[in-house]
Amino acid sequence: MKILVIRRDNIGDLVCTTPMLSALRQHFPQAWIGILVNAYNAEVLYGNPDLDEVFVYRKAKHRAAGSSKWRIWLETARLMLRLRRRGIDLAIVASPGGERYARMVGARRIIRDKPGQPAHEVERCCALLAPLGLPLAPGPLTPGPLTLRPQPRVVQRLQLAWAAFPGAPGPVLGVHVSSRKATQRWPAEAFAELIRRVLESGQIGRVLLFWSPGAAHHPLHPGDDEKAAAILAACAGLPVLPVVTGALAELVAGLSLADLVFCSDGGAMHIAAGLGKPIVCMFGDSPPAQWHPWGVPHVVLQTPARVVSAITVPEAQQAITQLLPLAGRAGSQP
């Protein structure tokens, strides 16, 4: 049996699909299982033990400078032809808009995404397996954990850079300061004050600072270089290590070196959950019931205003204090 899963949206969405991939492999151990993803999110599948093959296409909006839309479309058409020649028995469409790809590859059977179901994204993905006789959600069985593996060579490179970085004994806090949605953004001043508080109080030994790289006004990939620089300047003299993540593999590896993580709802939050980290997560107008960190200790911060900027620094510090007893020491050894 040849099964193709189609997941063509964002990083966190793909991470939330990994328990469904594990369930497929568990119940169909001899099947060939492939997945079609986009170039933006593909690296989170590095080393995934449940997949035989990963097929990557590039969205036109993510094309490199000098690359035309026609070239992107031609490459995608060639990929669809390759998959069609595989003779796909079953396509599982795990995200909206993916059904046309299932038709293009000529899948003999298609299980479609059903948007609008009131469940966590992990449970919604696993519910797609119900037609195959796998009552994972809703049902008596709970979906398993997320699956995410950092690339060892990237982890080692970051550890070497970290070895010469001063810091006090104690847990390592990963802080990710970026979010695509305006309602999910916390001010640079608030991040800086929180970092100063947890370091000066001795609660935290070191801080790893993460952000989306690039200029704020970049037309395709707006980033937070200026915001990160402002936070670092406000925390000068403190053990705050900037972690530049030009590739998704670097974000995964960097977060793997933290003991607990503070961030807004988004891809970094789901990556941290996939790495087993306790998480304090700030939610704006997204529903935590659908998107909270899966399978790890976490504290959700959300105000009645449904904007992250309304969350106070003392509230954030209290949540970190609450999770500290559950923090490991993943990052404490270089």
Language-model segment annotations:
Residues M1-P334:
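Catalytic machinery of carbohydrate-active enzymes
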